[in-house]
Amino acid sequence: MENIKKYYENTKDTLPNPMVKKFINMNIKPQNAIDLGCGAGRDTIYLIKNGWKVLSIDKENTKELISSKLDSKEIKKFRFNVQNFEDIKLEKNNLLVANFSIPFCSKDYFNEFWNKINDSILKDRILCWKLFWIK
């Protein structure tokens, strides 16, 4: 638990993932997004500041950390759920962001988890994700 708190503290002011920035630059009309494994909220905050309504999901409660970066108008576009991937419930969305989070799903549950992701994304919409790699 101490390591995860340190991670959130170290990443709370990090710039959004470059893929999310690139997505925003495509000038797609802001709609509903899910930030799956949102951590300290860098992508959530960026999406909201660019007009998106975001449901952020993480196994740790980082709601207050993220909320502190949003003004009163932006906070209305923010929702937060504490959920493990094995118990996840995903609502329909136009964009699902899952940067560095998918590998944390139990391999025994992965197929069901992936189907939930696939079923949640509305037709002709976008999944933005990044996995780990070795340099």
Please state what every model-predicted region is.
Residues 97:
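A conserved beta-strand element that flanks and buttresses the S-adenosyl-L-methionine
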Residues 100-101:
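Short catalytic micro-motifs in class I SAM-dependent methyltransferases
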